[in-house]
Regions:
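Bacterial Sec-dependent N-terminal signal peptides
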Residues: 1-24
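Hydrophobic alpha-helical and helix-loop surface patches within well-folded domains
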Residues: 2, 17-18, 82, 206, ...
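Acidic/His-enriched low-complexity segments
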Residues: 18-274, 398, 413-415, 431, ...
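Non-catalytic accessory/interaction domains
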Residues: 179, 202, 227, 243, ...
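Structural detector for internal amphipathic alpha-helices that build alpha-solenoid repeat scaffolds
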Residues: 542-546, 570-591, 603, 611-626, ...
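Amphipathic alpha-helical scaffolding segments comprising HEAT/armadillo-like alpha-solenoid repeats
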Residues: 550-560, 583-605, 625-640, 660-672, ...
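Short inter-helical turns and helix N-cap capping residues of alpha-solenoid HEAT/ARM repeat scaffolds
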Residues: 565-566, 608-609, 643-644, 674-675, ...
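Terminal, low-structured helical/coil segments at or just beyond the last alpha-helical repeat
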Residues: 798-822
Length: 822
């Protein structure tokens, strides 16, 4: 699963509960689930699922006289065993079936359960990664665009079929899904039969022959067009999109076959499943989900060719694909060991970026991951493998993802590439179609390398925190001396063992690498050099999971930026030279008043890597200091010539307040750019000065389906606050994906604030529906925030009271207690 993070730490203060977590080990297995056969059909009118489950089970080891299934929120119509109806007890969560006798591990039994799943009647939970946990979702069920899909992780598949809903339970399956014959279905495994019925329905029989985890079982149905990728012949690779987007399937997903081949080559293990399908659905409650052979994506991956110029979702696609080895083929045996799934998937994003887009792109991916972890580490530090937590959903954080991926890279650097991938091969083959814990991974590495690696796994997987180093360097009498101290305090009370690279650079651009090994609180290293270095860089590729405080003069940082061969080294130098609090524009201007720093920033707009060019452009937003004309000229060149759309777009935004009519010529030319991000930025920049043809410009773009362009048009319409714009706002907002909708709700709020009461009342049904019915808690919360802007209206107060009463997510319920409506 890949997290789609939208709101950082919104509820941290709400949930900082002083509570000692309990030990969370693997679920005890009293029974083994051998095979699941499901006959299911959706009732679109009441958003329920009619089902019959035939479950083949056997005692795991000890004899048993009853079985308990996870079955959340069902109406259980009857249960039979050995062709006879049997009594059962059911509390709405657990379904207990007694046998009246003891069964031993040589007995295989078949239980038949007739039921109706009622997911909308469940109390809703969720997390940052998975915003709801009711398992089965109906989207627009009473319209031609209706969809049905499931989300099983962590333990929500028991909301739509009875099972043993734990990650250490594997099964094979047959699913018979009956739907209207106009709909397309998808499930795990292969579609082996279509049965047409006389009532305009069809039953699709999907069969999964190889065992996989229960939480990876899925179904989906809707109006989808299936595109089979003809560039790949080893097995079926296919993509499911709604009809209006089907023509873009290969542009969106078409690098999947190359990813498969690359990962197979790295791991020495062929893709282990029958097929690989990807489907994009609306209102998905996560970023994406690696259901075996049938990955589900949120509709954020659905992009037009103009949007793909700005950004593709290769990282997400690679992430979910890599799970089919790490997570699906070998599955974590408990949520405590989740990094065995997610850290590897996170690392795959680096592997693919490095392979396909180049080493600099891989470094940039790693930099972003490290930044994500370090931000989270300011508020919590946990072991990667956590046997103590309050809620399994807490495991889905930047520790399990970003930090874990970086730790795997450190392990790779320590043992070497060949040993790393050979060890992964051993791990995958030894645990194929089974579950694993962290020590299975350690023992695979020890088997290959011949080295005891407990120290590494204890230090990085089983202990919280990260390394923090203080570094000083000085050169005297032909010798460079490094003094490195490890910070020891209440947050970090241990000494790390750290192999580190040191990059030493000289005035002629020459560089040399040295290696040091830290194992003490304070250590001194010396190197004989023929000349004084112009910069010294610890960990030049940014591979250490940690923080390095290495004070340097500006001249050294400038030399480091200009001469360092790594993106990480240049990034660190640029960041230190130009860092300022995000809201402190005056401080930024003061930094750029230094001609040497300003010159470097202008040089950085020509960096070989687009991410650093973009950072440089962003430092020049609204610049009005010394050397203004030089800055303006450089930004004009960026707009005309930079190959990256995001850099061009940011250059336009940097110049939008420069008040030079000549720039408007550039902006108008940019309205024809292939990139929607560039067009949106150009439109925003032009509208700043409210040109005579502003209304005509906006009219041209008001129906373009892109969030960047929407935001530019919406800001203009919000300031106008004309009554007739309400239908445009609500219509367009309904078309946006979840992330996009959250991003622009503030603009709609601006429109409402500046409108009269009649328009505000007209918006209330839209906001009320969103606040109650959106599956994503952050969208419901955003709708409430917009309603509060018009909260003086009696009708709004009444609506808010109804929203608060209808809310089932405990996080939001707790927040809403703070709002006074009277």
């Amino acid at each position: 699963m890949r997290i789609c993070l939208l709101i950082s730490f919104l509820f941290i203060t709400q949930f900082s509960i002083a509570q000692l977590p309990e030990y969370q080990g693997s679920a005890t297995k009293k029974w083994d689930l051998l095979h699941t056969k499901l006959y299911v059909s959706p009732n679109w009118d009441n958003e329920q699922l009619n089902g019959k489950a035939i479950l083949q089970i056997k005692p795991h080891f000890y004899s048993q006289n009853e079985v308990t299934f996870d079955a959340k929120g069902f109406e259980v119509k009857g249960i039979s065993y050995n062709s006879k109806s049997v009594e059962f007890s059911y509390d709405g969560l657990k379904l207990v079936v007694p046998f009246g006798k003891m069964l031993n591990r040589r007995d295989t039994v078949e239980i038949i359960i007739d039921y109706v799943a009622k997911p909308n009647e469940l109390e809703v939970g969720g997390s940052e990664a998975i915003t709801q946990d009711k398992g089965l979702y109906f989207v627009d069920p009473k319209t031609p665009k209706r969809q049905l899909w499931t989300q099983g992780e962590t333990q929500a598949n028991s909301c739509w079929f009875p099972t043993f809903d734990t990650p250490n339970e594997n099964h094979t399956q047959d699913i018979f899904l009956r739907v209207d014959k106009t709909l397309t279905t998808l499930s795990n495994g292969e579609l082996i039969e279509k049965i047409i019925h006389g009532d305009n329905t069809r039953t699709d029989h999907w069969q999964m022959k190889k065992p996989h985890a229960v939480y990876l079982t899925m179904i989906a149905a809707g109006n989808f067009v299936k595109t089979v990728d003809s560039t790949f012949n080893d097995f079926e690779v296919s993509y499911y999109l709604e009809p209006e987007y089907a023509e873009n399937a290969l542009a969106i997903f078409g690098r999947t076959p190359q990813m498969i081949c690359h990962f197979e080559e790295l791991l020495g293990v062929k893709y282990p499943w029958e097929k690989y399908s990807q489907i994009a659905v609306r209102e998905f409650v996560s970023g994406a989900m690696e259901n075996t052979t049938a990955t589900v994506h949120g509709d954020f991956v659905v992009k037009s060719p103009n949007q793909l110029v700005d950004n593709n979702d290769d990282a997400v696609i690679a992430h979910e694909l890599f799970h089919h080895w790490f997570g699906d083929l070998v599955t974590t045996e408990s949520w405590a060991n989740l990094p065995l799934n997610e850290s590897f998937a996170d690392y795959s994003e680096y592997l693919w970026a490095s392979h396909f887009y180049g080493e600099e792109a891989g470094e940039w991916t790693a930099i972003q991951a490290m930044e994500n972890y370090l931000v989270e580490a300011k508020t919590k530090q946990e072991p990667l493998i956590r046997y103590f937590y309050n809620d399994r959903e807490d495991m889905f954080d930047s520790h399990s993802y970003a930090k874990g991926g970086r730790v795997l890279h450190m392990l790779r650097r320590y043992v070497g590439d060949e040993a790393f991938f050979t060890s992964l091969n051993v791990y995958l083959k030894a645990n194929a179609f089974k579950t694993a814990e962290i020590h299975n991974l350690r023992m695979a590495f020890e088997e290959v390398t011949g080295e005891d690696l407990n120290w590494f796994f204890n230090q990085w997987f089983l202990t919280a925190g990260h390394a923090r180093l203080d570094v000083e360097d000085y050169y005297k009498n032909g010798k460079l001396t490094l003094e490195i101290d490890q910070t020891i305090d209440s947050v970090n009370a241990k000494i790390y063992h750290l192999p580190l690279d040191v990059l030493i650079g000289f005035s002629d651009g020459k560089t040399i690498y040295k290696k040091v090994y830290l194992k003490d609180e304070s250590q001194v290293f010396s190197f004989e050099l023929d000349e004084a270095p112009t910069y010294v860089l610890i960990d030049p590729k940014g591979e250490l999971v940690g923080e390095i405080n290495h004070p340097k003069k500006s001249e050294m940082l400038i030399s480091q930026y200009r001469n360092c061969p790594t993106v990480s080294g240049r990034f660190k130098a640029f960041q230190l030279l130009t860092y300022a609090p995000e809201t402190d524009e005056l401080y930024v201007k003061e930094l750029l008043s230094d001609s040497a720093v300003r010159k470097l920033v202008l040089e950085a707009t020509k960096d070989s890597f687009w991410g650093l060019r973009d950072m440089a452009v962003q430092r020049l937003f609204d610049y009005d200091g010394e050397g203004f004309l030089e800055v303006e000229k450089e930004l004009q060149l960026v707009i005309k010539a930079d190959k990256n759309a995001n850099v061009r777009a940011d250059a336009i935004l940097a110049m939008k307040n420069f008040l030079n009519p000549q720039n408007d010529i550039l902006f108008r030319a940019a309205l024809r750019d292939t990139s929607y991000a560039v067009r949106g930025a150009a439109l925003e920049a032009l509208l700043v000065n409210n040109p005579p043809d502003a209304a005509e410009l906006v009219k041209v773009f008001e129906d373009v389906r892109d969030v960047n362009i929407f935001a530019s048009v919406a800001n203009y319409y919000a300031e106008e606050a004309k009554p007739e714009r309400l239908s445009w706002f609500t219509g367009r907002l309904k078309e946006l994906g979840n992330t996009e909708l959250y991003q622009v709700m503030g603009i709609f709020g601006t429109y409402l604030i500046q409108s009269d009461a009649e328009i505000q009342l007209g918006a209330l049904p839209f906001l009320n529906d969103m606040a109650i019915n959106k599956p994503q808690w952050f969208l419901r919360y955003a709708a409430v925030q917009a309603m509060l802007l018009i909260g003086d209206l009696p009708e709004t107060k009444a609506a808010l009271k109804s929203v608060f009463e209808a809310e089932t997510d405990q996080r939001l319920k707790d927040v809403y207690l703070n709002y006074q409506l009277d």
